[in-house]
From Swiss-Prot:
Matches recorded under InterPro entries: Beta-tubulin_BS, Beta_tubulin, Tub_FtsZ_C, Tubulin, Tubulin/FtsZ-like_C, Tubulin/FtsZ_2-layer-sand-dom, Tubulin/FtsZ_GTPase_sf, Tubulin_C
PANTHER family xref list: TUBULIN
GO BP of this protein: microtubule-based process
Assembly and oligomerization: Dimer of alpha and beta chains. A typical microtubule is a hollow water-filled tube with an outer diameter of 25 nm and an inner diameter of 15 nM. Alpha-beta heterodimers associate head-to-tail to form protofilaments running lengthwise along the microtubule wall with the beta-tubulin subunit facing the microtubule plus end conferring a structural polarity. Microtubules usually have 13 protofilaments but different protofilament numbers can be found in some organisms and specialized cells.
Residues annotated for GTP binding in this entry: Q11, E69, S138, G142, T143, G144, N204, N226
Gene source species: Lupinus albus
One Gene Ontology molecular-function label: GTPase activity
Cofactor(s), names only, from the UniProt record: Mg(2+)
Residues noted as binding Mg(2+) in the record, renumbered to the chain: E69
Function recorded in the entry: Tubulin is the major constituent of microtubules, a cylinder consisting of laterally associated linear protofilaments composed of alpha- and beta-tubulin heterodimers. Microtubules grow by the addition of GTP-tubulin dimers to the microtubule end, where a stabilizing cap forms. Below the cap, tubulin dimers are in GDP-bound state, owing to GTPase activity of alpha-tubulin.
Region spans: Disordered: 429-448
Keyword line: Cytoplasm, Cytoskeleton, GTP-binding, Magnesium, Metal-binding, Microtubule, Nucleotide-binding
Places the protein is found: Cytoplasm, Cytoskeleton
Record protein name field: Tubulin beta-2 chain
Length: 448
C-alpha cells in the first residue's frame, strides 16, 4: 500500500500532530490503545497508509515525534492517545532550542538528527511502497523551523524520489510569540523552497479568525486551532485511505498544483465550518460546500486570495455525492470569478471525490489553492526581517552558534525572489511574447 510517514517536530508540530492522530484514529475506528473498535470494513481496508499492524492486532501510527526538550513529549505521552505511539519513536533532547533557528539547525538539532534519521529509516523499511513524508512544524520557533528543515533536507538526500509534504505554521501578522520569528521563518522558507515538494501554509491568526467569526468560539484555544488543521490534513490524504470515485495521491496533487517548481506554497481551507449550535439547522449541499470552500474567510493563512490570482487549485470532496454536480460547481466557480484565475492555465481546478465523509458529517470538502496572493505572507515576514537585520538586532544569538551573516543575506534574497516570481505570474497574460516578460520582471522587482 502507499504508506505515508508522519513526522512532527517542536512544540507546535507535536501539538498539531497529536490532534491529527485523534482525528485519523476516529476515522479508522481505532481507540486510544490502538485496538480496532469500528464497525465498517472500509475503515480497515487501507488502514496501513498511516498505521502499522503489530503482532497482537494493535495498530501503531507510522509517526516519528521529535523535540529538543522533553516537555511537550511528556504531556503527549500522558495524554489520551499517548499509549498508541511506538515508544522508540519519541526522540528528544534535553536542552531546548530556545526559539533559535541556529540551535535547531546547526548545534543542538544536529546532535540529535542522527537518532531521528535512524527512526525514520526503521519506519521507512517497514513500508511496502512508501509514498512520502508529511512533516508538521512551525516556522517561528527553533526546533520545528531549524531542526525541521534540517531533517527535511537530510530526508531529501536519502529519499530523493519520495514526496515531501509539509504543514508549516507561519508567524502571524499581528500575534507574535517571539521577537526573532522573522529571522527563523525566513531561514526556514529558504530551505523549504529548495527541499520540500508541497507546503501547506497555515497561521494562527487566520485560524483564530475562523474560530471567532465562523465557529463563534469566544475564547479559542490552541486545541481548537489544531482541530481545524487536522481536519484539513485528514482531507488531503482521505483518497489514499478510503475508496473514492476520483482518487488522488500526494504526487498527483503536486503535478496538478505546481506549475513552476519553486511556487509550491498552498493555501488550505475546509468546509463545512459551522458553530456547534447551528449545525442542526443546515442541510449540506455541494453548492453550499463549494461556496464556503472558496470563501476568502475560510483560508487558514493570513493572505487574501482576492488580492491575487489562482495559478491552480484542488478541491477534495468527501461523502456520497454526484461527480457531475461537483464538476458543474467547479466550472461554475471558474466562470463566475474568471478574473481570479490565470487564463494561461485552462481548467486549472482539479477535483477529487472520496466516498467516506469525516466522522460526524454527511459531506465535507478540503480546499488547496496555489494562489499568487500568498506572497503577502512572505512579503510581511520579509519586511520584518529587513527591519531587524538592517540594524543587526539579535544576530549575536545566531552567529554565536556558528552562523554567518551571509546566510541571512542569502535567505532574504531568496524570499524576495519568491515574492517577485509570484508577482510576475500574477501579472502575466496569455498572449504576451516572451520578450515582454523580461521588462515586466524588472518593473516587478522595482515595485517590490
Amino acid at each position: 500500500m502507499r504508506e505515508i510517514l508522519h513526522i512532527q517536530g517542536g512544540q507546535c508540530g507535536n501539538q498539531i500532530g497529536a490532534k491529527f492522530w485523534e482525528v485519523v484514529c476516529a476515522e479508522h475506528g481505532i481507540d486510544s490503545t490502538g485496538r480496532y473498535e469500528g464497525d465498517n470494513v472500509l475503515q480497515l481496508e487501507r488502514v496501513n497508509v498511516y498505521y502499522n499492524e503489530a503482532s497482537c492486532g494493535r495498530f501503531v501510527p507510522r509517526a516519528v515525534l521529535m523535540d529538543l526538550e522533553p516537555g511537550t513529549m511528556d504531556s503527549l505521552r500522558s495524554g489520551t492517545y499517548g499509549q498508541i505511539f511506538r515508544p522508540d519513536n519519541f526522540v528528544f533532547g534535553q536542552s531546548g532550542a530556545g526559539n533559535n533557528w541556529a540551535k535547531g539547525h546547526y548545534t543542538e538539532g544536529a546532535e540529535l538528527i542522527d537518532s531521528v534519521l535512524d527512526v525514520v529509516r526503521k519506519e521507512a523499511e517497514n513500508c511496502d511502497c512508501l509514498q512520502g513524508f508529511q512533516v508538521c512544524h512551525s516556522l517561528g520557533g527553533g526546533t520545528g523551523s531549524g531542526m525541521g528543515t534540517l531533517l527535511i533536507s537530510k530526508i531529501r538526500e536519502e529519499y530523493p524520489d519520495r514526496m515531501m509534504l509539509t504543514f508549516s505554521v507561519f508567524p502571524s501578522p499581528k500575534v507574535s510569540d517571539t521577537v526573532v520569528e522573522p529571522y527563523n521563518a525566513t531561514l526556514s522558507v529558504h530551505q523549504l523552497v529548495e527541499n520540500a515538494d508541497e507546503c501547506m501554509v497555515l497561521d494562527n491568526e487566520a485560524l483564530y479568525d475562523i474560530c471567532f467569526r465562523t465557529l463563534k468560539l469566544t475564547t479559542p484555544s490552541f486545541g481548537d486551532l489544531n482541530h481545524l488543521i487536522s481536519a484539513t490534513m485528514s482531507g488531503v490524504t482521505c483518497c489514499l485511505r478510503f475508496p473514492g470515485q476520483l482518487n488522488s495521491d500526494l504526487r498527483k496533487l503536486a503535478v496538478n498544483l505546481i506549475p513552476f517548481p519553486r511556487l509550491h506554497f498552498f493555501m488550505v481551507g475546509f468546509a463545512p465550518l459551522t458553530s456547534r449550535g447551528s449545525q442542526q439547522y443546515r442541510a449540506l449541499t455541494v453548492p453550499e460546500l463549494t461556496q464556503q470552500m472558496w470563501d476568502a474567510k475560510n483560508m487558514m493563512c493570513a493572505a487574501d486570495p482576492r488580492h491575487g490570482r489562482y495559478l491552480t487549485a484542488s478541491a477534495m470532496f468527501r461523502g456520497k455525492m454526484s461527480t457531475k454536480e461537483v464538476d458543474e460547481q467547479m466550472i461554475n466557480v471558474q466562470n463566475k470569478n474568471s478574473s481570479y484565475f490565470v487564463e494561461w492555465i485552462p481548467n486549472n481546478v482539479k477535483s477529487t471525490v472520496c466516498d467516506i465523509p469525516p466522522t460526524g458529517l454527511k459531506m465535507a470538502s478540503t480546499f488547496i489553492g496555489n494562489s499568487t496572493s500568498i506572497q503577502e505572507m512572505f512579503r510581511r515576514v520579509s519586511e520584518q526581517f529587513t527591519a531587524m537585520f538592517r540594524r543587526k538586532a539579535f544576530l549575536h544569538w545566531y552567529t554565536g552558534e556558528g552562523m554567518d551573516e551571509m546566510e541571512f543575506t542569502e535567505a532574504e534574497s531568496n524570499m524576495n525572489d519568491l515574492v517577485s516570481e509570484y508577482q510576475q505570474y500574477q501579472d502575466a497574460t496569455a498572449d504576451e511574447d516572451g520578450y515582454e516578460y523580461e521588462d515586466e520582471e524588472e518593473v516587478g522587482e522595482e515595485d517590490a
